[in-house]
């Protein structure tokens, strides 16, 4: 499942990388009403395209409901799966109900990548740009994504981890550092870590979303 809003510049590459990395995947793009041709760009790759205005959580639940497979993978439109992803996912799901990938950026940032991957490895805290995946049974058992306006990915990962375990696979996705480029590296890191800290301190996601509107 790939949720999108105005991602015409990246969605085709994401779909192509998924097709190359996974054995015969069912690719579903769930679009929130893009005005830049995202839906057409996705359809041109052969992906199924659904329309689902609303939050990213709602989009991913819509995609999961439409999917026919036993394994669900949630992929950001600016994130590329690595070669060998299919085998890595199968190995992870033989051990646990869910998993995620390590992270790498399209413009390498070694210190940040090491910090994020250490956090994921030690605490099993993962986010949507790490291509979270789960067996359908595990996803359904925890009730899918909760209707949160922000931090929906961390919330789902935590519930999956508690329910049936979550494995960090030894491969890295490549995700765009475009926000670092547009907003500045230091500012982006500070903003992200502040949101994570406030969420950990149980500040309601609705309040966080009002203060820090999420990218769709």
Segments (PLM) and residue ranges:
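Acidic helix N-cap motif at the loop->helix transition within catalytic regions
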Residues: 9-13, 36-45, 84
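A recurrent flexible, glycine/aromatic-enriched loop bordering the glycosyltransferase active site
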Residues: 97-107, 116-137, 141
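A conserved acidic beta->alpha catalytic loop
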Residues: 31-39, 79
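Hydrophobic helical membrane-anchoring modules
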Residues: 158-216
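Short aromatic/hydrophobic "clamp" motif used to bind/position activated sugar donors
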Residues: 72
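Conserved donor NDP-sugar-binding/catalytic core segment of glycosyltransferases
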Residues: 83-111
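Glycine-rich, basic loop-to-helix element that forms the pyrophosphate-binding segment
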Residues: 51-67
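Short, well-formed alpha-helical segments that are part of the catalytic scaffolds
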Residues: 6-20
């Amino acid at each position: 499942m790939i949720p999108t809003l105005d991602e015409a510049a990246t969605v085709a590459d994401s779909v192509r990388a998924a097709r190359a990395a996974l054995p015969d995947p069912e690719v579903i793009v769930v679009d929130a009403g893009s005005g830049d041709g995202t839906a057409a760009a996705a359809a041109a790759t052969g992906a199924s395209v659904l329309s689902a205005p609303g939050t990213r959580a709602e989009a991913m639940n819509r995609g999961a409901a439409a999917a026919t497979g036993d394994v669900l993978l949630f992929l950001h439109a600016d994130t590329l799966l690595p070669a060998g992803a299919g085998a890595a996912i199968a190995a992870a799901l033989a051990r646990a109900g869910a998993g995620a990938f390590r992270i790498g950026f399209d413009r390498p940032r070694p210190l940040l990548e090491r910090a994020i991957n250490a956090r994921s490895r030690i605490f099993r805290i993962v986010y949507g740009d790490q291509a979270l995946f789960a067996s359908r049974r595990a996803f359904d058992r925890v009730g899918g994504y909760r209707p949160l306006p922000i931090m929906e990915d961390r919330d789902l990962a935590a519930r999956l981890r508690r329910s049936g375990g979550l494995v960090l696979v030894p491969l890295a996705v490549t995700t765009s550092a475009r926000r670092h480029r547009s907003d500045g590296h230091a500012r982006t890191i500070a903003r992200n870590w502040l949101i994570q800290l406030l969420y950990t301190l149980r500040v309601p996601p609705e309040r966080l979303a009002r203060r820090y509107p999420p990218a769709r």
